[in-house]
Amino acid sequence: MRIDYASSAMDAQDFANLFENSPKAPGQQAQKFNRLMIQGLAENGAVVRAVTARPVTGTNCPSKFLSANSVQRGKVRYHYCSVLNVKGIKILWQTLSAFVTVLFGGCDAVVTDVLNASVAYGAVTAARLRKKPCIGIVTDLPELMVTGTNQNHVKLVRKIMQKCTGYVLLTEAMNEPVNPEHKPYVIVEALCDSTIKPQPEVKTHTSCIKKCMYAGLLDARYGVKAMVDGFVLANVPDSELHIYVNGPYVDELQKVTQEHPNVIYHGIAMNDEVVRAEIEADLLINPRPTHEEFTKYSFPSKNMEYMASGTPVLTTNLPGMPEEYKQYVYLIEDESAEGIARAIKTTFDTVRSERDRKGYSAQEFVLNEKNNLFQSKRVLSMLEAK
């Protein structure tokens, strides 16, 4: 089966080459999710062409025009659509580029990231004209995106979803608002990279420092302030909190780092660097509050990345996280700063070898049962059933 996969996903090295020196590099979670799905489809025998609208803006790329080009990366052909990096024109240009590419590309099916509305609208429109199936990847409800909503964007994404013939969703709760016509769908939660090298059941520790880490959007809605305050309150001896990525909380965070040298802010980093840091850490924390409505509609992809590292995970009891995951993580029951402080102290009171085994079991679980080869095969089966 020949599949055109329309999104902003770039090959990892191509992405790094374009953005590694940019002070405002695009978010990498969507990049990683789509790239893993693309690679999984290809490894399962599909002939995949990634139809990519590179995520450039006036603030992260000085070039006003990027020409189209195609490159082969392993089993995947990346077709980078041309970019006219001019506000007010860029989105229309991307839509037309994706439309033409898919319309005349000869694919058997289209898969698209519906939240990347410009490339998705072009791709799904071309698929409908060619009477080909189009699967929409829905990783968030457009109305509830924590990064902000634009009503025109919400309406366009809703229109794209209506045009799709099936869906890939992260939680069962998403099905009702996304799929009122009861079209075929699969739940994949998140994707674990099948190429990850498993960590040993008990790690070799070369430092007495207890290194905590958070890598995600720095937003109070994500519980970051409560986490930082909780870490400071916990006052665990010989402990550090390392924080990556960016967001509106960054100014306040930098003030905290001046008062508390063991809170260390690294800024934006490429995902490979973040993953290496996760492997080297002693505890990975996800403080996302459970009361926010969006949490029941999305699986925390950060938890998947955390669990895949083999490092133990401390997370809130998110409604979008199925029960089968919870035996592999430590849970924050009280999401206040005081509650997070208690959870951190309780976790570090656990024998280190036991914490290591918890992290090892989590990695084994996601590598064996939630890897991108297994999950993408389910998507391919849905397409082949049409």
Question: What feature does the model see in each segment?
Answer:
Residues 143, 157-199:
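Donor nucleotide-sugar binding/catalytic pocket of nucleotide-sugar-dependent glycosyltransferases
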Residues 222, 272-277, 286-305, 315-323:
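Nucleotide-sugar-dependent
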Residues 329-338, 345-352:
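Conserved acidic donor-binding segment of nucleotide-sugar-dependent glycosyltransferases
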Residues 2-6, 168, 204-231, 242:
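Conserved donor-binding/catalytic core segment of Leloir-type glycosyltransferases
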Residues 34-39, 99-104, 118, 125-129, ...:
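Membrane-proximal helix-turn-helix segments that form the acceptor-binding/catalytic region
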Residues 1-63, 166, 229-234, 318:
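N-terminal subdomain of nucleotide-sugar transferases
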Residues 335, 352-384:
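A charged, aromatic-enriched C-terminal amphipathic alpha-helix characteristic of glycosyltransferases
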Residues 251-278, 283:
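Nucleotide-activated donor-binding/catalytic signature segment of Leloir-type glycosyltransferases, i.e.
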